[in-house]
Amino acid sequence: MLAISGLVKRYGARTVLDGLALRVEPGEVVAIVGESGTGKSTLLNLIGGLEQADAGSIRIAGTDLATLDDDARTRLRCRAIGFVFQAFHIVPHLTALENTVLPLVLQGVAAGERDARATAMLAAVGLGSRTAALPRELSGGELQRVAIARALVHGPALVLADEPTGNLDPDTAQTVLALLNNRARAGNAATVLVTHSEAAAATADRVLRLARGRLAASGATAEHGTDGR
């Protein structure tokens, strides 16, 4: 579960996030939309522990990021968070299986167990026959499936997806989004999806718009209130 309150982030004199609040329950998918430059990616970086907030709290599975030193924050990130990015971030000289297994390697999972878990996750995303394929042998949709498998293989409490379908054609994008959301829900992960795509946002349980440093309900989800919960 993700719980954020009073989050503030400044870059010099510019306040990007101003008292932002957000709560995402296990198994829930929340889409964040907004204009370019409103701080959507900054928000994900703060949640993922890649940047430090100026004020406020971020709790992931009950742990307040502000109470952790750099090493502990890295351990939490490896254990509890799965990342899916627009640019895939697939290691080019590793096979689909070797890419997928990386979070389990970082956690020190035994080789036999981690290979079995990665193989099962690749099968779950429709790549059971492509485990030995190198990235250059995979399509854009297949590469994003590898990225999803890698993000979910270690059973994270939280999945952060930053424009995960930005490089995909519309049909492939819909397939990949359905896969990401369904697998995250199956693993009971809280999911935050940042997107410019209305079609992508429509797959979420809630849609929140980031503007003037805060989140408000957007479109058909307005009945959920305006405080990000």
Task: Locate the predicted segments by residue.
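Conserved switch/coupling elements of ABC/ABC-like ATPase nucleotide-binding domains
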Residues: 212-223
